[in-house]
Each structure stands twice: as structure tokens, then as C-alpha cells.
Amino acid sequence: MFCNVRLELDLPFAHSLKEKRRTVRSLKDRLRRKNVSVVESSNQDFWQRATLELSLAAVSLGAAEEKREEVRRMLVNYDEIMIADLREEFVKL
């Protein structure tokens, strides 16, 4: 079971591309520590917007939902970002 998530983020505290990259890099590092694959897919040139694509794998739907909820809690509690849009999709192979 795979879970794919597309995040549209607002970065209200970023005042330059350098600050945005620092924030996004920190967020990506935290997600990778939770065994989540992550890539910044668009909005690279906008300093207060970011679009991230996340993917995680699990052995069952229940485990994927649990991991996804853990990631969602971490994102909500991350002070430097605001979630503008979140789309998720579960894929069973």
C-alpha cells in the first residue's frame, strides 16, 4: 500500500528564497527521518509558497493511514508553515 500526498504550503515567515530553502530543507529532513520520500515539485522560485510531493509505503491500509496521520500531525505542529492545500491518494499494488 502506498500513500501519496501533495502539499501546497504557505511560508509566511520566509522573506527570501534563502529562508524558504532553509525552511523546506528542514521540513524535508524531518519527513525523511520518518521514512517518507519527499520532493519539492513546483513553486521553487516563489519565496512564500512551496509544493511538496510525499510518498510512503506500508504493508496495509491501516498502517498507511496511521503513518499518514503521524505525518499530518507533524506538519500541523510545524510552526514555520501553513498548509494551504493537502491532497492524498492511496494506491494498492
What are these regions, as identified by a protein language model?
Residues A57-L93:
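C-terminal structural segments of small proteins and small subunits
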Residues V39-V59, V91-K92:
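Short, charge-patterned binding micro-sites
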Residues K18-S37:
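Short amphipathic alpha-helix segments
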Residues F2-N4, L31-R33, W47-R49:
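Short connector loops at helix/strand junctions that flank enzyme active sites
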